[in-house]
């Protein structure tokens, strides 16, 4: 006795629903496999993208206390016309305001690019516990590249450092930004010469 088989074509709605479920399942699995450091560095990268959108050097930063982001910052130096408008300084100021204390001893900073001397000094002064860095800065970095101000024995506070978290993603964003900037300048020069 044979039962006739009937093929039922899935509806468009059913396919869309399956695709959405698959998308969220993949996103959930990616989050599960992500370390805490990667999770918070992703948040810093989102801040850096805000700077990128303003045509600023894409540097982003978050400060975490008790497994919660308490402050965020991104580079706005050109936008504000202010040398002090670095991502790290913005985040430190916000974190101090949020905690009601300039001492951020139980906080960790996640930053997409190795801090400069000014920001490294502020990190030490704020008594930050740890700094997690995405990409190193061989020209101006002061967490080991040019100097290591964060761990100088002569200072009354040293900061724990973790380097290279999502380094490729952070580096790619920075190199892409500078490539676009060079291309714009080249195009502008060529247009000026042809005018």
Predicted feature locations:
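Short beta-strand scaffold segments in enzyme catalytic cores
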Residues: 59-64
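Zinc-dependent deaminase
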Residues: 24, 28-54, 102, 118-195
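Helix-adjacent hinge/juxtasegments
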Residues: 92-122
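A short, polar/charged loop-to-alpha-helix boundary motif
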Residues: 79-89
């Amino acid at each position: 006795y044979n039962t006739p088989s009937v093929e039922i074509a899935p509806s468009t709605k059913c396919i869309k629903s399956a695709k959405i479920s698959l998308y969220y399942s993949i996103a959930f699995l990616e989050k599960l496999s992500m370390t805490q450091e990667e999770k918070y560095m992703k948040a810093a990268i989102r801040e850096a993208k805000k700077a990128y959108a303003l045509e600023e050097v894409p540097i982003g930063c978050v400060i975490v206390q008790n497994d919660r982001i308490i402050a965020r910052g991104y580079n706005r130096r050109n936008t504000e016309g202010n040398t002090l408008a670095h991502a790290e300084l913005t985040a430190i100021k916000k974190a101090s305001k949020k905690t009601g204390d300039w001492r951020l001893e139980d906080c960790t900073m996640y930053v997409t690019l190795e801090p400069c001397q000014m920001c490294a000094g502020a990190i030490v002064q704020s008594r930050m516990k740890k700094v997690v860095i995405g990409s190193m800065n061989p020209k101006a970095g002061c967490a080991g590249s040019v100097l290591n101000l964060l761990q100088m024995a002569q200072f009354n506070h040293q900061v724990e450092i973790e380097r290279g978290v999502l380094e490729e993603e952070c580096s790619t964003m920075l190199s892409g930004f500078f490539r676009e900037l060079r291309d714009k300048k080249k195009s502008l020069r060529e247009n000026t010469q042809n005018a």
